[in-house]
């Protein structure tokens, strides 16, 4: 099969299986309301949990830095792309989360891939939750290590996988808050087990940082757990983009010396780092926004009892409505759009087969009226 035939075959199969994705150009987005093709929708698909995307101080910080330092970083961090602004942000992140070092990355996907592909050598063992993000699964299976997936949020399964495995250094990986189900990992038990077996524990807290824990320090702080490696991202609660890895001095130096993702990638723009530094300040003083988000979560849970048979057990901003069938999920998503509500349909391979869903994400800017309209619309359109 030549290139064109293979590509066309795969695309046609994607369409046939109702997995085809359509990229939509958003005209205006203030986080609560988005405009697409001249239509206005209440947005329940944004990861900007605290509504900082349009924060005036953060926007001004980006403008100021772009004027002062220019737009591009001009090189990798190991050439000339690393500035005193990057250094300052890394130091502030490390101090905030009580780690010796922080390393900036251009995305969470890159950060996770860099850690796993750089650390893992032949016969090392990787133990990861079955519902781990693609940025964890893909580099793990592409590494020279041995991969084991334990039952979702099941420490007993993790332990069984470990004791029935053979190999060298164990790396345990989990998310703090899972991106598609919104549930929280049993971090305390997993952390204790990792220490017992002298392994490394890596936690991806993309959806917890800024939202959970004291001062927004994330789900690990909330559960009094300090993993050996912590990945945080700036595209969710921080309202920007990018990521950072928090770790020991030794691991940080190892990544700097051996990670191709750091060596051969252009560094984050200085203006972006400057804006993230301002966003960090806002996060540290965002208790009011976190309380408002929690109020919205509580309001949704209290008023969505009519949908309880469709909901997963989540107490976070991520509230999945499980439909199962790909086509039914897409139809419901389109029907909600006709009611002025934007909720994306999430289908395999992002989620397991037969678990297609509407992934509702609540934020601090939603009103009670927004949430009531969402619940009422889903109930009327999909009363099963």
Curated annotation (Swiss-Prot):
GO molecular-function term, one example from the UniProt record: 8-amino-7-oxononanoate synthase activity
Binding site for pyridoxal 5'-phosphate: 108-109, 179, 207, 233
UniProt record, GO biological process: biotin biosynthetic process
Sites bearing N6-(pyridoxal phosphate)lysine, chain numbering: 236
Domain of life: Bacteria
One Pfam family recorded for the sequence: Aminotran_1_2
Pathway: Cofactor biosynthesis; biotin biosynthesis
Keywords (A to Z) from UniProt: Biotin biosynthesis, Pyridoxal phosphate, Transferase
Gene3D superfamilies the UniProt entry points to: Aspartate Aminotransferase, domain 1, Type I PLP-dependent aspartate aminotransferase-like (Major domain)
Binding site for substrate: 21, 133, 350
Cofactor or coenzyme needed: pyridoxal 5'-phosphate
Homology family: Belongs to the class-II pyridoxal-phosphate-dependent aminotransferase family. BioF subfamily.
Chain's role: Catalyzes the decarboxylative condensation of pimeloyl-[acyl-carrier protein] and L-alanine to produce 8-amino-7-oxononanoate (AON), [acyl-carrier protein], and carbon dioxide.
Assembly and binders: Homodimer.
Protein name, as recorded: 8-amino-7-oxononanoate synthase
């Amino acid at each position: 099969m030549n290139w064109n035939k293979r590509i066309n075959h795969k695309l046609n199969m994607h369409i046939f299986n109702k997995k085809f994705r359509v990229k939509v150009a958003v005209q205006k987005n203030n986080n609560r309301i988005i405009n697409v093709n001249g239509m206005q929708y209440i947005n329940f698909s944004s990861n900007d949990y605290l509504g900082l995307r349009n924060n005036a101080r953060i926007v001004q910080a980006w403008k100021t830095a772009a004027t002062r330092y220019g737009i591009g970083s001009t090189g990798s961090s190991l050439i000339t792309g690393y500035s005193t602004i990057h250094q300052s942000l890394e130091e502030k992140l490390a101090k905030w989360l009580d780690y010796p070092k922080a390393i900036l990355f251009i995305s969470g996907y890159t950060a996770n891939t860099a850690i796993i592909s750089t650390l893992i050598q032949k016969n090392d063992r990787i133990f990861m939750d079955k519902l781990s993000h693609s940025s964890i699964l893909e580099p793990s299976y592409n590494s020279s290590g041995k991969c084991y997936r334990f039952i979702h949020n099941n420490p007993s399964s993790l332990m069984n996988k470990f004791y029935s495995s053979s190999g060298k250094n164990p790396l345990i990986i989990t998310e703090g808050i899972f991106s598609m189900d919104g549930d929280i990992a049993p971090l305390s038990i997993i952390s204790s087990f990792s220490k017992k077996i002298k392994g490394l524990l890596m936690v991806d807290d993309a959806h917890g940082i800024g939202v959970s824990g004291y001062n927004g320090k994330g789900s690990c702080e909330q559960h009094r757990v300090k993993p050996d490696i912590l990945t945080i991202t700036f595209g969710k609660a921080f309202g920007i983009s990018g990521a950072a890895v928090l770790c020991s001095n030794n691991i940080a130096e190892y990544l700097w010396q051996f990670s191709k993702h750091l060596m051969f990638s252009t560094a984050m723009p200085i203006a972006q780092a400057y804006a993230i530094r301002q966003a960090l300040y806002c996060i540290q003083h965002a208790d009011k926004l976190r309380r408002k988000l929690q109020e919205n979560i509580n309001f949704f849970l209290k008023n969505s009892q009519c949908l309880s048979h469709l909901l997963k057990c989540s107490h976070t901003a991520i509230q999945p409505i499980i439909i199962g069938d790909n086509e039914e999920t897409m139809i419901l998503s389109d029907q909600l759009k006709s009611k002025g509500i934007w909720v994306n349909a999430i289908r395999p391979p992002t989620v397991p087969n037969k678990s297609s869903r509407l992934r509702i994400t609540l934020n601090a800017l939603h009103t009670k009226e927004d949430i009531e309209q969402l619940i009422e619309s889903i109930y009327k359109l999909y009363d099963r």
